[in-house]
Regions:
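Positively charged n-region of N-terminal signal peptides that target proteins for export
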Residues: 1-4
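Bacterial N-terminal signal peptides
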Residues: 6-16
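Short boundary/loop segments of OB/S1/cold-shock single-stranded nucleic-acid-binding domains
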Residues: 18-33
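Conserved hydrophobic positions within beta-strands
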Residues: 37-39, 98
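Short aromatic-glycine-enriched beta-strand elements
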Residues: 45-59
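Short, basic/aromatic beta-hairpin or loop at an interaction surface
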Residues: 66-80
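Short nucleic-acid-contacting surface segments enriched for D/E, G, S/T with interspersed K/R
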Residues: 84-101
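OB-fold/S1-family single-stranded nucleic acid-binding modules
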Residues: 106-141
Length: 158
């Protein structure tokens, strides 16, 4: 009986750690922000991918901090498999790609966020800043929150 109780407690502890790893508590989910940037790094991971980018202003110009250095942001997305299912690959998003993304920023205010799942968008606009900005009218929508094809496949099951 003691072994069974110990195993149950151990299982509960381990599962809690797993849930904490996949928590979005570090992001402010009450506020979605939309940013446009120029891709500087595309990191594909087994569980999550990250897009790092230099922030662009509404005029398409690179935004600089008080020291004259580019303002760099990062966004965490789904897995490489989910992205590939939505046509987001290293080939479709090469370095220098201009894109717009909706995200939840870290609560501590650092320049990093998670792509919001409700209404979040990832829009690619190529390598030149389009007139009118990078948006659904001037670019291609790759991920669109609940409309993401990768999410549809998961919902339908085998």
């Amino acid at each position: 009986m003691k072994k069974l109780l110990f195993a149950l407690i151990l299982l509960c502890t381990i599962s809690t750690l797993g849930l904490a790893h996949h928590s979005f508590a570090m992001y402010d989910q009450t506020k979605t922000i939309t940013l446009t940037g120029k891709l500087t790094r595309f990191v594909l991971g087994a569980n999550h991918a990250q897009l790092l980018f230099d922030l662009l202003g509404p005029d398409g110009k690179q935004q600089l901090d008080s020291n004259g250095k580019p303002i760099v942001w990062g966004v965490e997305t789904g897995s490489a498999k989910q992205l590939a299912g939505a046509a987001v690959t290293v080939e479709t998003f090469p370095y220098g790609t201009i894109f717009t993304v909706s995200l939840w920023q870290l609560r501590d205010g650092r320049n990093f966020g998670a792509m919001s799942l409700n209404g979040g968008r990832l829009i690619g606009c190529g390598t030149t800043f389009p007139q009118g900005g990078c948006n659904e009218k001037t670019g291609k929508v790759y991920l669109n929150g609940r409309d993401n094809p990768a999410n549809d496949a998961r919902r339908q099951g085998p």
